[in-house]
Regions:
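Acidic/histidine-rich catalytic neighborhood of metal-dependent amide-processing enzymes
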Residues: 97-165
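Acidic/His- and Gly-rich active-site-bordering loop/insert found
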Residues: 1-89, 108
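Metal-dependent peptidase/peptidase-like ectodomains
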Residues: 145-146, 155-189
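Acidic-enriched catalytic cores of C-N bond-cleaving enzymes acting on peptides and small amides
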Residues: 178-209
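Acidic-glycine-rich active-site phosphate/pyrophosphate-binding loop
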Residues: 67-80, 143, 158-169
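Predominant activation on well-ordered alpha-helical scaffold segments within soluble catalytic domains
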Residues: 10, 30, 97-104, 131-134, ...
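Short, conserved micro-motifs enriched in small and acidic residues
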Residues: 84-97, 181-187
Length: 209
């Protein structure tokens, strides 16, 4: 594995991995990690997981997805100065290159580390590689903290909380617009629900003090 992250990312960009077609990149990742004797390597479909087992008192999961959105005449990597162009170069083969470099260089990290390269993030959640691992091999993802290598312009975003999807059903009674008092407006009844959602301030997440 090269320590030139720009070249390493370009190499990954040139391996096509549109969602549901990540097998070539998964093969490449698995082969790149196979020589790391300090890592236990597992594979589930196109998901590749490599773990240290050093007996540390905590474990950090470092994860990144293999897939990209469909290309738009940008299949082949192109370097201009210190800028790399190509499908997935930002989201998120740059992160994958960093993960590979660290996995090769950190033989004895202060925390045990799980390196998780997973498939199908850019599509419906039900198809996601992370969900596939959680369903079939949840122990592979056990950890005390997780770092996702999504692009953030170099800013650490701590404690991302995901999303909540709620289905609310409000009944109503039809009426003519000239006589609204004869009916019951289901949309208006949603007002207090939206007020409560808007008023919720979220929660403060603290990681490692």
């Amino acid at each position: 594995v090269t320590t030139d992250l720009l070249a390493a990312t370009a190499e990954l960009v040139d391996i096509p991995s549109v969602s549901r077609h990540e097998s070539l990149l998964a093969d490449h990742i698995a082969a790149a990690l196979a020589g790391c004797d300090w890592l236990h390597l597992d594979r589930l479909g196109d998901n590749v997981v490599a773990r240290t087992s050093l007996g540390r008192d905590r474990r950090v999961v470092v994860a990144g997805h293999l897939d990209t959105v469909p290309p738009n005449a940008n299949e082949v990597s192109r370097v201009e100065g210190d800028t790399l162009w190509g499908v997935g170069s930002c989201d998120m083969k740059g992160g994958l290159a960093v993960m590979l470099d660290l996995a090769h260089s950190l033989e004895e990290p202060t925390s045990d580390v799980t390196w998780c390269f997973y498939a199908r993030e850019e599509v419906n959640r039900d198809e996601g590689g992370l969900l596939e691992i959680f369903d079939q091999q949840p122990d592979w993802l056990a950890g005390d903290a997780a770092i996702l290598c999504e692009p953030t312009d170099g800013v650490v975003e701590a404690g991302c909380q995901g999303t909540t999807r709620v289905v609310v059903r409000m009944g109503g009674v039809r009426a003519h617009t000239a006589r609204p008092w004869a009916g019951r407006n289901a949309i208006h009844r949603l007002g207090p629900v939206l007020d409560r959602v808007t008023a919720w301030g979220g929660r403060s997440v603290v990681l490692d003090g």
